[in-house]
């Protein structure tokens, strides 16, 4: 699999004072934006059940989230993000046991791979960034996204992007530290927008994922 950045993240339920608290901590509001996300999978959810998440974001193109290191525990997740279409196509074919086509982007292989639209919704996002210093004095940029989906669900996410697995523990330390400063419960975990969408509007698909992940929320 072509290597991409490793995304380490933790989702949480934002409160009415979350943005104010981010300002107090020295955070900077980068932008407010509205976009549509569309997720694709097979009718059996072969990708999601294997912890792969294929998304097309309006204005940003395709992204495939691939599972990170095994054994990562706690109220956070770790994924490798692929955004180059040839890498995405190659990984999709590997997961689904298909031959890699000679040419064509993601859209061209949706039909041959049996991938169809599973969910589509609009999100309003406030994107923040801030720098935290760790116990070792090293500074790390963290991003905080505060999202409200068009079906009425609000969720926040603290995220760090790293280049190699060895950097993950330090990123987790910063994420946990910022989460505590924001008043997030230590073991609290908010479900992703997609999971809530499936639970509300495609309950049979939601049950398929529960069979695999139990009470653990993905992605």
Swiss-Prot record:
The modification N-acetylalanine is found at residue 2. Coiled coil: none annotated. GO terms for biological process: thiamine diphosphate metabolic process; thiamine metabolic process. Residues 5-201 form the CYTH domain. Its cofactor is Mg(2+). One of its GO terms (molecular function) is thiamine triphosphate phosphatase activity. It catalyses: thiamine triphosphate + H2O = thiamine diphosphate + phosphate + H(+). It is an enzyme of class 3 (hydrolase). Its EC number is 3.6.1.28. Mg(2+) binds at residues 7, 9, 145, 157, 159. One of its GO terms (cellular component) is cytoplasm. InterPro entries: CYTH-like_dom_sf, CYTH_domain, THTPA, ThTPase_euk. Its main location: cytoplasm. It is found in: Cytoplasm. Keywords: Acetylation, Cytoplasm, Hydrolase, Magnesium, Metal-binding. Substrate binds at residues 11, 55, 57, 65, 125, 157, 193. It comes from the Eukaryota. SUPFAM superfamilies: CYTH-like phosphatases (SSF55154). Binds 1 Mg(2+) ion per subunit. Monomer. Hydrolase highly specific for thiamine triphosphate (ThTP). Belongs to the ThTPase family. This is Thiamine-triphosphatase. It comes from Bos taurus. The lineage of its organism: Eukaryota, Metazoa, Chordata, Craniata, Vertebrata.
């Amino acid at each position: 699999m072509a290597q991409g950045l490793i995304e380490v993240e933790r989702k949480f339920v934002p409160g009415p004072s979350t943005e104010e608290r981010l300002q107090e901590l020295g955070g900077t509001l980068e932008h407010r934006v509205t976009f549509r996300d569309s997720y694709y999978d097979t009718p059996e959810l072969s990708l999601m059940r294997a912890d792969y998440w294929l998304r097309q974001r309006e204005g940003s193109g395709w992204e495939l989230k691939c599972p990170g290191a095994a054994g990562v525990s706690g109220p956070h997740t770790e994924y490798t993000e692929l955004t180059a279409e040839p890498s995405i196509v190659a990984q999709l074919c590997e997961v689904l046991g298909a031959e890699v086509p000679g040419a064509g982007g993601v859209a061209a292989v949706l039909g041959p791979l049996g991938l169809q639209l599973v969910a589509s919704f609009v999100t309003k996002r406030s994107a923040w960034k801030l720098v935290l210093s760790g116990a070792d004095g090293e500074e790390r940029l963290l991003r905080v996204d505060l999202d409200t989906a068009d079906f009425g669900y609000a969720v926040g996410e603290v995220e760090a992007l790293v280049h190699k697995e060895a950097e993950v523990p330090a990123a987790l330390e910063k994420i946990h530290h910022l989460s505590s400063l924001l008043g997030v419960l230590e073991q609290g975990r908010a479900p992703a927008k997609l999971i809530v969408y499936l639970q509300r509007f495609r309950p049979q698909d939601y049950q398929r994922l529960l069979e695999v992940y139990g009470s653990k929320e993905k992605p």
